[in-house]
Curated annotation (Swiss-Prot):
Zn(2+) 2 binds at residues 48, 51, 81, 89. Residues 164-180, 393-407 have a biased composition (Basic and acidic residues). It comes from Mus musculus (Mouse). A zinc finger (UBP-type) spans 22-141. This is Ubiquitin carboxyl-terminal hydrolase 16. The gene is Usp16.
Amino acid sequence: MGKKRTKGRSAPDTVASESAEPVCRHLRKGLEQGNLKKALVNVEWNICQDCKTDNKVKDKPEEEAEDPSVWLCLKCGHQGCGRDSQEQHALKHYTTPRSEPHYLVLSLDNWSVWCYKCDEEVKYCSSNRLGQVVDYVRKQAGVRTSKPAEKNNGHIELENKKLEKESKNEQEREKSENLAKETIPMDSASQITVKGLSNLGNTCFFNAVMQNLSQTPVLRELLKEVKMSGTIVKIEPPDLALTEPLEVNLEPPGPLTLAMSQFLSEMQENKKRVVTPKELFSQVCKKATRFKGYQQQDSQELLRYLLDGMRAEEHQRVSKGILKAFGNSTEKLDEEVKNKVKDYEKKKAIPSFVDRIFGGELTSTIMCDECRTVSLVHESFLDLSLPVLDDQSGKKSINDKNVKMTMEEEDKDSEEEKDDSYMKSRSDLPSGTSKHLQKKAKKQAKKQAKNQRRQQKIQERFLHFNELCATDYTEDNEREADTALAGEVEVDTDSTHGSQEEATQIELSVNQKDLDGQESMIERTPDVQESPEDLGVKSANTESDLGIVTPAPECPRDFNGAFLEERTSGELDIINGLKNLNLNAAVDPDEINIEIPNDSHSAPKVYEVMNEDPETAFCTLANREAFSTDECSIQHCLYQFTRNEKLQDANKLLCEVCSRRQCNGPKANIKGDRRHVYTNAKKQMLVSLAPPVLTLHLKRFQQAGFNLRKVNKHIKFPEILDLAPFCTLKCKNVAEESTRVLYSLYGVVEHSGTMRSGHYTAYAKERTASCHLSNLVLHGDIPQDCEMESTKGQWFHISDTHVQAVPITKVLNSQAYLLFYERIL
């Protein structure tokens, strides 16, 4: 029998040394890999089998509320609670008389091996038999890494020190808690606690984000509402003839939402000092399989997948409720019921709890310089991805010159292209927003012959289509073709006519997919496209949102060697053939119809033409020019994100109003075949709905050619941020005549190291929950100037299980990757 020790979990510092050799003489008798493999099939991890049999897992007294350490027998796979528990089932399992003794056990908390016979720690490395067995158990438990002990050595040491302090020196812990209470006097109901999170294996990116979400008390409040059984939602009818709203009884929330609620509850408990978010991470991996395998990941992507996953579950929940309200629980539905369900789903009576907390709105304002018509595009966002400039001004100017020279050459050679052969060398234009297209553009020389063959097939296809449609053209169209203006490029005898510039612009707007033989939809609707400078500036969730309307041609300048394509007249035939194929000739020019993709996972965009005063269309709530010079501040990043742009040259606006005026009336010819007018325009993206919780993402990870790099430049960010200089004059959720939209910093995610090997940590602010923020989210009460709350609190630096109090100066000097601000005014 082994001697009873007060701490069976403590491990010496050299437990994970790669060069250490096992010194225990009981390895041969105490290790049985065959029995382990059989025992670990469909096993429930981290639960004492004997306690579960005795029904003591749920009926524990309050003083044993914290889960005891669980030890795995390496002989038979038995899981028992350790010596620090009341029952000590792991020790009893060893002392039970058997023909073959069970000497060795493995801690499922810190993966240390203990020999009861030697009564001491057993050293191992990944190359020997014991290390291989431990690695196998870790993989079965869901923690996959080749050198487990070495990678987690620091975390093991920190966790063991914390456990020793917890068991041997209770008074010191009470003193630290009292000190925190003195620093931040809180009410017990609104107290926000800070705990460590276990690293499941390269999951620091997950832990850092969850630390900040756990410091968002309004999220916990809304999740309590979501979990309430029998929730009834009233949806206004889409048909004006119906007056009674539809009452929808919602089902329980989805598994990801429930796991999130359970995690926040565990973070609020007083007994646990370290939380293991295994269930929540498992649900995230089910929603997004890219996070499986315990590899290094991006914390901002994790945040987006998490929020989008919970929002999708809420949308599905409402859809099922609407279906049940119509009395159809089966999958087979008639068309009438399907249409009704879709109509009610489009009403969106109540936004999801994710949108209510993190959701804001961006408005892109575009004004034609010729007719002064103002058009708006509204789109929602959950976070803003801001550019981080890294002394690239020199490179940008060089790229600008290259683009300009290429444009001039293309204009000069456009007439010569009529007689050129189809086989002509060119460099394809990458979109600037897709890494795939960037790589494809660089490999275009190798695929030139293949692409040309595909283009020839497309040309034959659409020329055949034009021949079929030629008989439908009126005599007016034929006369137009015969009397084409000098300098116009005649694409086809019965197809659209346009100037060289127009043909070039149409050609440039074709998607890269056309080169692969795929059709692309080109809608004839007024719109603007992101300017070259705007590439890499908009947030990840809004970079491609303006694609709902016809883009004016753009020329990306973010990449070295990006040149405009040189097209022959045959290729222009293809482009205009595509244009004729996809245009709807029956559209009334008096109506501006925008086709919005119906995507349940992304918020729809709203397009409208406003009779706004052109002088105030681009005004903001507060002056913004002061932030145009300081390039190392978060305000300058916001300034770049919301700057006023000029749409000109290759990025002109296709103006519907000017196009109608060019045709001398609102009606085009029968086939809708008319001249498109591109004009210079102004464009600006501003915040039109300030979110309750503002999440800012600094785009530090960038691609330069084939290489990936991280921008390590320090970006200054304030404790109190005023968003007013970046909001529209008619911003929602802002008090009348207010010129301030204030946010208080409460969370930071920091990335240290390189892109290939780095570590995520979090800074979180322990504070009193804001009642004004809760009123804004729950009841829509807009905070007033006289109601601004205090932002006092204590900051903590959290690196997985290690939690340390830090001053605000250290927080402000950190290399921020994600910033979390809560609305205070």
